[in-house]
Each structure stands twice: as C-alpha cells, then as structure tokens.
Amino acid sequence: MPEQSNDYRVVVFGAGGVGKSSLVLRFVKGTFRDTYIPTIEDTYRQVISCDKSVCTLQITDTTGSHQFPAMQRLSISKGHAFILVFSVTSKQSLEELGPIYKLIVQIKGSVEDIPVMLVGNKCDETQREVDTREAQAVAQEWKCAFMETSAKMNYNVKELFQELLTLETRRNMSLNIDGKRSGKQKRTDRVKGKCTLM
C-alpha cells in the first residue's frame, strides 16, 4: 500500500528480542506470540483522527540488527515520532539505543518538537538488569518520555501509543484503539484534554 501524505509515521527501534514486534502486534491486533521471529521491517496501519479529519497511524517495526543502516536512516528521515524499546532484563539493550537516539538527533536536527518515547519492555519479568530510576535518568538526559510496558501481560501498551500522540504538539491527534471494526458504538474518553481514545 503506498504511503499517503496524511500518514502519521511512528518508527519503533530497539535491539533484537526486546519485544518491539510484540508491542506493535499487541497494540494493532491484540495478540501476543511467545516465539521470537526476527523482523527485517514490517509496517502496520491504524486509522486515527487528526486535526478533525481521518489519517493513518503508520507504525514501522524495524529490524533489531545493525545490518541495514540505510533502512534505519530512511525510517528516521520519514518518521514523525519514535519509540525506542529496550528490555528491562538486558542493560545492553538500553545501551544499544544510544547510537540510534544520536542518529535521530543528527537526521532530525532536534527532538524538541518530535515525540520520542523510551520504553522499558518486559516489566513483568523478575530478573531485571535495568532499574526504573536508571531508565528514567536516560530519558531525562535525552529529553524524552519514559514508560515501562509488558506486551505479554498487555500492560501499558495502549497507553504507550496514546502518550506518544499526546506528546505530538503540532497536530491534534486522536487514537482509535477499537481494532475490532465492529458496528458497535465506540466510547470516547478525554485524555489530558487533548487526545481522544475512541
């Protein structure tokens, strides 16, 4: 499907095995898979409300491998918002996000007006290598938001994408999370007076 000019592009980065695909699939399809299948690059679409009209939230799930730097640079140049995922069970996965963050700053010039979320996934696991305060300190240094999630337990997954749109100050964004495409009437909640979950 070709990109539309009104697509809002979110790019998900992180090391292999941190749960990027699991977070995206949990959000878009409501499913979770236990088996690890490496991703080269997948794109998912979700209809959202944007500036009182309809646009498409396009989520690009990138490879955890460093074998495709040209794809990384292209994803960053086209991206409107970024989710940087690490596993709380792997300090190395947090450290590997540093060069990606620097590349985003290099390509975009500044991240002050760009929504960036640092996400500690697998927070349901007991064998942690990254303390919450440590990750919060990194997020503060990078001037980005931070959230812990569990794709497996469906903890903070919807909230992650809602918060990302809340951080978008250039447009008034609303997120349709109903994914079932049924004829049922959708309930609307106001979140922080700016974005709407439908």
From Swiss-Prot:
Q: Which domain of life is it from?
A: Eukaryota
- Residue numbers carrying Cysteine methyl ester: C195
Q: Which PROSITE patterns match?
A: RAS (PS51421)
Q: Where is this motif: Effector region?
A: 36-44
Primary location: membrane
Q: Which portions of the chain have biased composition (kind: Basic and acidic residues)?
A: 178-192
- Name one cellular component (GO) term: plasma membrane
Q: Which residues bind GTP?
A: 17-22, 33-39, 61-65, 121-125, 151-152
InterPro entries per the UniProt record, alphabetical: P-loop_NTPase (IPR027417), Small_GTP-bd (IPR005225), Small_GTPase (IPR001806), Small_GTPase_Ras-type (IPR020849)
Q: Where is this region: Disordered?
A: 178-198
Q: Write down the membrane topology.
A: Lipid-anchor
Lipid sites, type S-geranylgeranyl cysteine: C195
Where found, per UniProt?
A: Cell membrane
Tell me which UniProt keywords the record has, alphabetically.
Answer: Cell membrane, GTP-binding, Lipoprotein, Membrane, Methylation, Nucleotide-binding, Prenylation
Membership in a protein family: Belongs to the small GTPase superfamily. Di-Ras family.
The record's function comment reads: Displays low GTPase activity and exists predominantly in the GTP-bound form.
Q: What is this protein called?
A: GTP-binding protein Di-Ras1
Q: Which organism is it from?
A: Homo sapiens
Q: Which gene encodes it?
A: DIRAS1
